[in-house]
């Protein structure tokens, strides 16, 4: 693995937000004012964001941008506070989330389509994970997101729908019912059994981010295996591949460097 090449790739190919995320992750640099202004300009009046669906504030994109704020170490302030409130205000009484109805009118992937249990499960795991990072796991008066998640998993511990939902949920399951609970152990075992070393770098980095945020140590077998495969999958130009295509390689590289730094590999 070549850290210098990875840094050079992001600095040469990344946009201002990606470069700012890199600086915050590796050198604890505060984000430039221009980056904060850019984020604020894209935030909608209701506090939400549109990224894949720029026309409308939505759950997926707001959680996505909050993960950038996590990278930038922006946990309070005029950008993350309204974004967290946007998510909390749309948590449903059963503890879960669904995508906003306005998404239906847009030509978007099925994993963003509201009303599908597969969408609800992975978005619930995603929102819970992100909000935990900001110290706001659930809205007062609703059920715990874990209640919704455990109502939609099979006997092995795998959540309904996309495999990634199970590993994204690990942070919530680690918080409640707890790191030593059966649901948490089963979810980790599901991911271990389904793991592929051939996943794209961004997918491996996403998994590692969830494992780290859930508290799995560097010597855990799944963590160790995933770190080794992530390092091996670095491209010759220093980047890591994204499952969303070459356009997102700089962001994937930032995500890889984040987990490598978090686990003490760089």
Regions found by a protein language model. Give the residues of each.
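Preference for long, amphipathic alpha-helical scaffolds in soluble/luminal domains
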Residues: 1-266
């Amino acid at each position: 693995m070549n850290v210098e090449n990875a840094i050079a790739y992001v600095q040469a190919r990344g946009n201002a937000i990606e470069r700012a995320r890199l600086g915050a992750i590796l050198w604890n640099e505060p984000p430039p004012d221009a980056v904060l202004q850019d984020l604020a300009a894209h935030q909608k009046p209701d506090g939400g964001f549109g990224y894949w669906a720029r026309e409308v504030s939505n759950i997926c994109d707001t959680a996505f941008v909050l993960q950038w704020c996590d990278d930038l170490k922006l946990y309070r302030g005029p950008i993350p506070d309204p974004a967290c409130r946007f998510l909390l205000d749309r948590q449903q009484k059963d503890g879960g989330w669904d995508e906003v109805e306005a998404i239906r009118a847009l030509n978007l992937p099925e994993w963003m389509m509201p009303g599908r249990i597969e969408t609800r499960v992975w978005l619930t795991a995603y929102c819970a994970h992100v909000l935990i990072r900001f110290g706001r796991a659930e809205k007062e008066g609703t059920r715990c997101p874990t209640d919704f998640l455990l109502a939609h998993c099979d006997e092995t511990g795998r959540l309904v729908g996309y495999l990634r939902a199970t590993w994204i949920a690990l942070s919530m399951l680690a918080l409640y019912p707890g790191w030593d609970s059966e649901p948490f152990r089963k979810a980790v075992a599901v991911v271990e059994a389904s793991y592929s070393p051939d996943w794209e770098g961004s997918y491996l980095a996403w998994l590692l981010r969830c494992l780290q945020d859930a508290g799995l140590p560097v010597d855990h077998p799944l963590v160790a295996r995933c770190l080794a495969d992530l390092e091996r999958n670095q491209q010759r130009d220093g980047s890591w591949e994204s499952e969303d295509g070459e356009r997102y390689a700089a962001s994937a590289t930032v995500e890889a460097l984040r987990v490598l730094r978090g686990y003490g590999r760089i």
